Amino acid sequence: MVCFTQGLKLDLEKPIEEQGPLDVIIHKLTDVILEADQNDAQAQELVQRFQDYIDTHPETIILDPLPAIRTLLDRCRSYELIRRLEGYMQDDRICSPPFMELASQCGEDTIAELKKHRLTFPFICKTRVAHGTNSHEVPSDDTGTPEAVDRRECVLEERIRQRLRWKMAIIFSEDGLKDVKPQCVIQSFINHNAVLYKVFVVGDSYTVVERPSLKNFPTGLSDRKSIFFNSHNVSKPESSSDLTALDVVEGVCRPPSDDVIRKISRNLREALGISLFGIDVIINNRTGQHAVIDINAFPGYEGVPEFFTELINHIQVVLQDQNPEAPQFSQNSTAPEQAASICADRACPAASGFVTMATKEAWLVEDDPSNSKRLQHQRLSCNLPPNFQNCVAPMATKASSQ
């Protein structure tokens, strides 16, 4: 059976073998992985059960590999990857903002460390854990969840929120260092005329959506008090606040280069072996360079109405790559019919199918009635040399065909 409307939901609390055989598993286990990494026994058991299935079924396509997801959940690791990619690509149009980890309270040596890492005021502080709204906001009393979310899912989300009880912050002076709460990642703030470009990648295609962002601030030390904010709210399509209100456009103001976005997306996909991810890009208003400020595992794809179609297309491609002798897709067939044909050609048992363990966002495709601008929808070609992939991403798992 192949389900394209909602997907079969995989229950990790039951033996996975009894729920297969499985051709493709699409998951969003970020909350569970975070809990497991924080020594939650039940979450560790669930992740291990899933990993055991992957190890014993290398033929199953995993979207996306767990080690790569762990990299994206850790801003230090993902920022280091961005830095190394910048060095590899050697493209003057691309830059990675300087950053450093702050593992303890600011002390006498903090200023020296900032200078060592080429960080200047103002800079932005973010939680080291990077995952959806949880890594951007302080939990509030009205964080309800839809009825469709499982009880286990609700518990995990609430636990994560309770542990991430601070907002992002912009620090303008040495006096403001007292507002920095470890563990966090400090990243240079780059003026970008209050425009954020969210790149949503699905396999070999991507869509760029324009969103509001933080306004420009004077460079260097100032007597401004630290600003605390919820970046998820700031970058919402309908966002309107003093933080995003730009008095005047300064310096360079232009949309991102399609060639640069394609290059960044392609190299990230090859380095990590992932298919479903988002990239936050800003344009430095002084140099015109493209700066990658965050990478997200399996984002919400808001503003990408054709997400589900692109996902099905990508599944078709990975199934075809795994079984080149399968019939080629017919131009007159629908996406579900084509993928079903592949599955049938592989002699899939009746219980075989595409399975999702995703949270509420995973299969959600919303229209975009907001003011966000959809700029580009393009396809990638992947040619990152294997030696670089091995250098930056030994975490790629054999369970994925990417």
State the predicted function of each range:
Residues 21-25:
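Conserved acidic residues
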Residues 217-225, 301-310:
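A short, polar/charged loop-to-alpha-helix boundary motif
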Residues 266, 308-316:
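Amphipathic alpha-helical segments that line or abut small-molecule/effector binding pockets
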Residues 19, 29-33, 43-240, 247-250, ...:
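Active-site nucleotide/adenylate-binding loops and adjacent lid/helix of ATP-dependent enzymes
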Residues 3-20:
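A short, well-structured beta->alpha microelement
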Residues 27, 125, 187, 279, ...:
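Active-site flanking residues adjacent to catalytic metal/cofactor-binding acidic residues
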Residues 257-258, 265-305, 373:
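Conserved metal-phosphate-binding beta-hairpin within the catalytic cores
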